[in-house]
Amino acid sequence: MTIHLRLKTRDWDFWTPILLNDIHSENLDLELIRVQSLPDNFAQENDCDAAEMSLSRYAMRRNTGDDQNIVGIPFFIMRGFRNRCILTLQDSPLKTIEDLKGKRIGLSGWQDSGNTWTRALLLEAGVPMESIQWTLSRMTDSDPIDFERGDGFVDNRLVFQDPQETPLVDLLKEHKIDAIFQAFMPAHYYDKDFGLRQLQPDFVSQEKKWFNRWGFVPGIHLLAMKEDYVNKHPEAPSLLVHHLRASQLMWLAKRRKYFETTPWLIESLIEMAKSLPTDWDPIGFEANRKMLDEFARQQYLQKLTSVQRDADFLFPYKGI
């Protein structure tokens, strides 16, 4: 019997084999629904059975018990190191995590998974969160205005909401903040005269050192499914996870073959193979336990949760 499953997800390139029907399953008919931003609570939406979901928002829902009809699956659609996500001006004297102590940092979402991991870099380097003045606003003038982005976290003592939602890039270039935490690079970032750079000039080597210390690549977005769908189709999580992983692996194989899509993609592929184990993006609960325990600890240290949770609490479903 073939089951139909509708998955809301961003348009990651590694879903291309699924979209081209290069990945087949006799038991799963997967419909990918492309979204530009992740739904706040996909369980309340009628047009999907599963969704890519922020790890932070999932964990916070678990913490407050507001996770009705949501099953977290330990399959991480998005992972990423965070050193690369700290930006400053091209001519800034700041070059290390430690240099951020006592500075002004802008970010577009306080509770975001990525920013939680980025603040963890500060804590590891001995930089207290309380030593920094934080400003919440949109990244660029093309991003939507959201005066509620800081609700529950703005205290007007250390954490502020910019009253005009002035773009963070503008605040940085006007020297009103010293750095930005951002998951995705702003528009025109790759233009030669844009004027921003990663805080750490050697951010790649710093990320390798981080991996050697911790042993995982931080999870950012997970796969989540509706509980009533899983109850009706208990085989669905395993079918979906292996279908998605097959697509990712096929896409990686194609990138290794057709590396001329960008001039130096081959260098990145070689460096990844040399610096990371083949299972750097593992599937399953036990393989991700250490990462999830640390994320739960960081949420508690950063006062995103009032109780320190752990991997077992965050992921009661152990079917994968």
Where are these regions (language model features)?
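Tryptophan-rich aromatic "cage" segments
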Residues: N288-I320
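Short, glycine-/small- and polar/acidic-enriched structural segments
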Residues: R6, D13-A125, W134-D143
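Short glycine-centered helix-capping/turn motifs at secondary-structure transition points
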Residues: N21-D22, N46, H175, F194, ...
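Pocket-lining segment of extracytoplasmic ligand-binding domains
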Residues: I145-R256
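Amphipathic alpha-helical segments that form well-ordered structural scaffolds
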Residues: W117, L121-E124, L171, M291-L301
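Secondary-structure end/capping motifs
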Residues: A224, Y229-L301
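Short helix-initiation/N-cap motifs at beta->coil->alpha
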Residues: E31-F42, K95, I132-D170, L269-M272, ...
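Short helix-loop capping/hinge motifs at secondary-structure junctions, enriched
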Residues: D91-I97, V127-M129, D228-A236
